[in-house]
A protein has these predicted regions:
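Internal maturation/activation junctions in enzymes
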Residues: 14-64, 196-206, 210, 214, ...
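Short linear motifs in exposed loops
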Residues: 91, 297-298
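Short, well-ordered alpha-helical packing segments
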Residues: 3-10, 36-39, 44-48, 53, ...
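Active-site cavity-forming subdomains of large catalytic enzyme subunits
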Residues: 1-170, 174-175
Length: 511
């Protein structure tokens, strides 16, 4: 983990400049427990981190299974994730099968490969691929059987890869306008396909591109899109847990229709471009990113996930006096010290210009695009079950995603067994599951101070918006930014991972 030790040195002003994915063997007990007791509390309730384990914060840890795990194994993993946030399972055979879609061209072949791999081992699966679809060189065969590597957010599969990514903001698109949807996904597909012309200087990346050219077209705001498409009844179905009733079956059929149509548009566009320019076709073109930061640009619910609430305060971390944060102040947004800025008594600072303050939180009142639809206010998003989230995630995984779908399923302690059963069944029945993050769910209305997302009422939202207007001294944000940005490069900007997935402060412990 030397790379994580190096990463610690480039974290500036609490702004993450490193993100990693560390994949360990399923039987590596030391790796499985590496992050246990990472955080502890003193007598006053203040959190501190074990300095010997500080570098482990720089990456996610995943255990890779090459056989189908038992229900008990999955249950233990889900339980561990509830208590520590770590211990995720990755099912490698599904990842390898998807990454060989140029030869495993349908579900039956994919499932046959997975069964051979899981029951007879990797070597037998390798021989089966070579005898059925080869012969391949040893180098290419090694590459094909190693395509279960993940990028830091888990949405791209490959081996020695760089992947060109693009994203469609579905919350900006009319569900009834298929032509608009087609244009958006076609534009995204072309924007990544053209980068396949790039030639890497590093030999191993050149070889990987030669064997396995990959692109990834993602979307964000799927939840918003579906609310606009199906209305409040869809939200109520979610609130009921997405049951398998007649109405639910109709909703799922329509969801699948949208997802599959977008996938086909992307693949056809990328392949047409590659054929025209004599490039090898990628065998997987679609993915879903976590989309935390980019979703802020249009107020989209990130990726496939539901939003935190219909209305909330969004807090974004900046270093103190960052030009963007200063421009936000001129634009009317409030700024407060971050969670890591405290006085000598451990109390949060209130004045962003206090000399002891090193980081700022810009507070932005946010309203989702469907907040004012009749009945939408009556839906408690925070009560959406883990199984409902998992079901929607698997819809995306089955009907749109060809790589993997970046997912964080939030769950409560009483949902551990049900969620473990759902994951185990998805793996056991070859339904397409590879890996997903699981996060213990806190109450959306908990009184923790200065959370990244803080749900608010409609009345609070209107009041905060009025205050933004009152404080505004410049109606042109770009002009305000030019006032403070002198064009110099800085070591820090908006936090790359401004989500609620890492709620504990990143301040270093005192010696």
């Amino acid at each position: 983990l030397l790379i994580d030790e190096a990463a610690v040195t480039i974290v500036a002003g609490n702004i993450r400049r490193s993100a990693g994915m560390r994949q360990f063997a399923s039987d590596d007990k030391e790796a499985a427990s590496a992050k246990e007791n990472l955080w502890s509390q003193d007598a006053n309730g203040n959190w501190r981190i074990d300095p010997e384990k500080d570098a482990l914060r720089m990456a996610n840890h995943t255990r890779v299974y090459h056989t189908k795990p038992s229900y008990k194994t999955v249950l233990d993993a889900v339980t561990k994730q509830f208590h520590s946030g770590e211990g995720a399972i990755q099912f490698a055979p599904e990842a390898i099968a998807r990454s060989n879609a140029d030869i495993l061209k349908d579900d039956e072949l994919r499932k046959e490969f997975i069964e051979i791999y899981s029951e007879q081992g990797k070597d037998e699966a390798r021989n089966w691929i070579n005898s059925s679809y080869g012969p391949f060189s040893e180098e290419e065969l090694d590459h094909r059987m190693s395509r279960y590597g993940l990028n830091p957010c888990g949405e791209i599969l490959g081996n020695d890869f760089h992947c060109n990514l693009a994203e469609v903001h579905l919350n900006q698109i009319d569900p009834e306008n298929f032509e608009e949807q087609k244009k958006a996904f076609k534009a995204a597909a072309l924007s990544v396909a053209c980068l396949l012309n790039h030639e890497f200087e590093v030999e191993r990346y050149r070889k990987s591109r030669e064997y396995d050219p990959i692109v990834g077209v993602s979307f964000t705001g799927l939840f918003d899109f579906c609310v606009h498409a199906f209305g409040t009844p869809w939200l109520k179905w979610w609130e009921a847990g997405r049951p398998d009733c007649e109405e639910g079956k109709a909703f799922k059929k329509q969801e699948a229709k949208f997802l599959d149509s977008w996938r086909k548009i992307v693949k056809e566009t990328v392949w047409e471009y590659c054929d025209k320019h004599n490039l090898r076709r990628p065998n997987r073109c679609t993915t879903v990113q976590p989309a935390g930061t980019k979703s802020l640009l249009t107020g989209a619910a990130p990726g496939w996930h539901p939003p935190k609430a219909q209305r909330f305060i969004r807090r974004i971390t900046f270093r103190k006096n960052d030009p963007i944060a200063l421009a936000c102040m001129d634009y009317g947004y409030s700024v407060v010290p971050s969670q890591s800025d405290k006085d000598e008594n451990g109390c949060l600072l209130d004045n962003p210009f206090d000399p002891r303050c090193t980081e700022w939180l810009v507070e932005i009142p946010t309203e989702v695009s469907w907040a004012n639809i009749d009945g939408a206010d009556q839906i408690d998003i925070n009560n959406f079950s883990a199984l409902a989230q998992f079901d929607f995630y698997m819809q995306v995984q089955k009907f749109y995603t060809e790589h993997n779908t970046s997912a964080t399923v939030e769950f409560r302690e009483n949902e551990i067994e049900d969620l473990a059963k759902a994951i185990h069944n998805a793996i056991e029945n070859n339904e397409g599951y590879i890996s997903a993050a699981l996060l213990a769910r806190f109450s959306a209305n908990a009184t923790f101070p200065r959370l990244p997302f803080e749900p608010i009422s409609k009345e609070e939202y209107i009041s905060l918006q009025n205050k933004v207007i009152e404080r505004k001294v410049n109606n042109d944000f770009f002009d305000a930014l030019n006032k403070y940005d002198v064009g110099e490069l800085s070591e820090a900007g908006p936090a790359g991972c401004d989500s609620d997935k890492c709620l504990l402060p990143l301040a270093k412990p005192k010696d």
